[in-house]
């Protein structure tokens, strides 16, 4: 571990900061240890300055604290022999501080940011897989977890704290990573968690209703996503031109790469572009023909559904924009694998096809059902619910979508959290024209079992909402549960 010193860390902001050797950087006083730097920020739920005495008692070497209402910017105090340096707007500066602390890890690998409501996980995984096939040592950071490909460790949030993000990136650099695809959430952008990162390329997948319990309305949600392009080192922008928001952004980003599978591109109006010219769906995926600023080609994809064609094209355009040769990308495309819990297909002789997907927004559920329909000769079943203590407005919308696009809707629990499961189900049913035709079953494992056992061999059962997750939150408890494991057991362990 390279030497870290408080004076060097704060040189751009506080030239007269004292010299102190530093071990680690933390926002959590509970894990602060001897020699650490404790950073006391004012958060949405707690004021970290209240925990300064605890951090001092645990032997920290120094403290950086929010100056607002306490001190002037750059003011230095001492508490029990521990220097406390106050900085104003500490949340906004935290990413830069952590970047200096961890020796600017985003300078030492090729970092691609991916934002949007749906498709972030699949697109980042495709970017990491594809770049590794071309010789990079690739990593991912996001919803499924952080780590080198094949060594991903689960995480709580899509985008961690500003300190966590820089720390994770530094760890990946230490492990030899040369390429990292990172999901960038709207929360992470608004809360400045990636403010000091340098992205040679940034991808926008789409925008639809989600997180309105946090952002309030779609205008603020869109504004949060736009921060990646307006306030960050986003490098080359790659934008989905099939999305209405994407088309608005392309008008503001003349150097962006436009990507489309719905003929929303006029090559004369965009600097660089990539578009599908023909897509044929089959049992094992899709055959995609495309044209682009870099040339034309054909790809055999093992991913299910139209939206995954879009995700793959976005990944392809990004790697082309970064300079990877088209010929090499085409040679390796057939080796790309589906992503865990993202339109993941489970089959067994004599049983229905079961698809497990993370779709938990109205738009994602509609697209997942449309994708499953392309591969369904019989009835299409949909097992889903909605999370408790989250945006209630999307529940009836998802009910209406399940009723319209599935032949059989099975409404059940997702993560009810502290809400009554039946109340959530009732909110979903309120969006259906004929709720009496829906099957209602509160226990999720029981609902999945019911659907899989009742469905016929040529039916498809979409189990939506949890994807890769291996837990269910009921009340304040985090219980062991996995749709993937449940389905695999029902099909005799064959996936």
UniProtKB/Swiss-Prot annotation:
One of its GO terms (biological process) is peptidoglycan biosynthetic process. Disulfide bonds: none annotated. InterPro entries: Mur-like_cat_sf (IPR036565), Mur_ligase_C (IPR004101), Mur_ligase_C_dom_sf (IPR036615), Mur_ligase_cen (IPR013221), Mur_ligase_N (IPR000713), MurE/MurF_N (IPR035911), UDP-N-AcMur-Glu-dNH2Pim_ligase (IPR005761). It catalyses: UDP-N-acetyl-alpha-D-muramoyl-L-alanyl-D-glutamate + meso-2,6-diaminopimelate + ATP = UDP-N-acetyl-alpha-D-muramoyl-L-alanyl-gamma-D-glutamyl-meso-2,6-diaminopimelate + ADP + phosphate + H(+). Pathway: Cell wall biogenesis; peptidoglycan biosynthesis. It is found in: Cytoplasm. A motif (Meso-diaminopimelate recognition motif) lies at residues 414-417. Carboxylation is probably crucial for Mg(2+) binding and, consequently, for the gamma-phosphate positioning of ATP. Its EC number is 6.3.2.13. The keyword Cell division applies. One of its GO terms (cellular component) is cytoplasm. Keywords: ATP-binding, Cell cycle, Cell division, Cell shape, Cell wall biogenesis/degradation, Cytoplasm, Ligase, Magnesium, Nucleotide-binding, Peptidoglycan synthesis. Meso-2,6-diaminopimelate binds at residues 390, 414-417, 465, 469. Belongs to the MurCDEF family. MurE subfamily. HAMAP family: MurE (MF_00208). Catalyzes the addition of meso-diaminopimelic acid to the nucleotide precursor UDP-N-acetylmuramoyl-L-alanyl-D-glutamate (UMAG) in the biosynthesis of bacterial cell-wall peptidoglycan. This is UDP-N-acetylmuramoyl-L-alanyl-D-glutamate--2,6-diaminopimelate ligase. The lineage of its organism: Bacteria, Pseudomonadati, Pseudomonadota, Gammaproteobacteria, Enterobacterales. The gene is murE.
């Amino acid at each position: 571990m390279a030497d870290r010193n408080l004076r060097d860390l704060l040189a751009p902001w506080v030239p007269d900061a004292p010299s102190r050797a530093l071990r680690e950087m933390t926002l959590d006083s509970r894990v602060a240890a001897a020699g650490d730097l404790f950073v006391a920020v004012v958060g949405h739920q707690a004021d970290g300055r209240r925990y300064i005495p605890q951090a001092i008692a645990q032997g920290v070497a120094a403290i950086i604290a929010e100056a607002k209402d306490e001190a002037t910017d750059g003011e230095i105090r001492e508490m029990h022999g521990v220097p406390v340096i106050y900085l104003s707007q500490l949340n906004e500066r935290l990413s830069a501080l952590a970047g200096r602390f961890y020796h600017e890890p985003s300078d030492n690998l090729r970092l691609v940011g991916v934002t949007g409501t749906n498709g972030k996980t699949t697109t980042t995984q495709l970017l990491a897989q594809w770049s590794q096939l071309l010789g990079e040592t690739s990593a991912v950071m996001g919803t499924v977890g952080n780590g080198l490909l094949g060594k991903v460790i689960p995480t709580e949030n899509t985008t961690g704290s500003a300190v966590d993000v820089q720390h994770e990136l530094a760890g990946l650099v230490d492990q030899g990573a040369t390429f990292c695809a990172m999901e960038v959430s709207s929360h992470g952008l608004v809360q400045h968690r990636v403010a000091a990162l340098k992205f040679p390329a940034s991808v926008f997948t789409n925008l639809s209703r989600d997180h309105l319990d946090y952002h309030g309305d779609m205008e603020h949600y869109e504004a949060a996503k736009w921060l990646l392009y307006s306030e960050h080192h986003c490098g080359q922008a790659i934008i989905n031109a099939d999305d209405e928001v994407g088309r608005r952004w392309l008008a503001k980003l003349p150097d962006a790469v436009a990507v489309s599978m719905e003929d929303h591109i006029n090559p004369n109006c965009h600097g660089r572009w990539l578009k599908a010219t023909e897509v044929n769906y089959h049992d094992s995926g899709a055959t995609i023909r495309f044209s682009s600023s870099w040339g034309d080609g054909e790809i055999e994809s093992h991913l299910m559904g139209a939206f995954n064609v879009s995700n793959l094209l976005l990944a392809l355009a990004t790697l082309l924009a970064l300079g990877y040769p088209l010929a090499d990308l085409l040679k390796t495309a057939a080796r790309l694998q589906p992503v865990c819990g993202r339109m993941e297909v489970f089959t067994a002789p004599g049983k229905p096809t079961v698809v497990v997907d993370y779709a938990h927004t109205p738009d994602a559920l509609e697209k997942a059902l449309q994708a499953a329909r392309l591969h369904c000769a019989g009835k299409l079943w949909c097992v889903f619910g909605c999370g408790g203590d989250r945006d209630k407005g999307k529940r009836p919308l998802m009910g209406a979508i399940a009723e319209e696009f599935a032949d059989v809707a099975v409404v059940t629990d997702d993560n009810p959290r502290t809400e009554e499961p039946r109340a959530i189900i009732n909110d979903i049913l309120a969006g259906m024209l004929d709720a009496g035709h829906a099957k209602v079953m509160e226990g999720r494992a029981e609902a999945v079992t019911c659907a899989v056992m009742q469905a016929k061999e040529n039916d498809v059962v979409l189990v939506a909402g949890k994807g890769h997750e291996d837990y269910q939150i009921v009340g304040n408890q985090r219980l062991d549960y996995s749709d993937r494991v449940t389905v695999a057991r029902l099909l005799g362990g064959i996936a």
